[in-house]
Curated annotation (Swiss-Prot):
Pfam families noted in UniProt: LexA_DNA_bind, Peptidase_S24
Start-end of DNA-binding region: 26-46
Originating gene: lexA
One of the protein's GO biological processes: proteolysis
Protein name (database record): LexA repressor
Active site: S156, K194
Amino acid sequence: MLTRKQFELLKFINERLKEAGVPPSFDEMKDALDLRSKSGIHRLITALEERGFIRRLPNRARAIEVIKLPDLGGNTGGGRRGFTPSVIEGTLGKVRPPSHSHAEDESDRNVAVPVMGRIAAGTPIEALQTRSHTISVPPDMLGSGEHYALEVRGDSMVEAGILDGDMALIQRNESAETGDIVVALIDEEEATLKRFRRRGASIALEPANAAYEVRILPPNRVRIQGKLIGLYRKY
């Protein structure tokens, strides 16, 4: 049995994974549960991990995956059966393992997403014409629109569960809402993956790592090139 706070945190993490493809930061968890400090979040996460509901990736800061949800039946909270993590695992690009009888059909329906390079300073997305390879992604992971993948380099987003070496799945988009994690092109030179927020007339590009500073820029220096919709990770 989970306590109310444990269930609320598990539900919040799961919903954020489904919506954004990455887990919330500890500060976001603290605010969502109306706790005064992050130490309470640490205790709740430890309890959820001990009970087998989540997994923290070893040697990776605050990278969390939901392993299962409680079978709540008619209880409040709307638990779902058959849950699997939102992060795509391994090299097959499966979000949820298909039943044996439908395995081949599921594989045939997967979408080949082009890997357009690395998300690092120096190269605008449009200039990356050579596609190194593709990754196979379930169509329900993508939704509508045009998509591409970028290899993440660096640790500036680790507290959002985005790790060095991950493949970021990006939906092409020229606009963003506050809180979205976006591919932003700065001064037509530097591409970066950061959380987008508006601060008055300016744009804030926020890292998810206390070692990095928030960048505050005027809108004419920032061009949105896509929004993060998920991650492809090899183990």
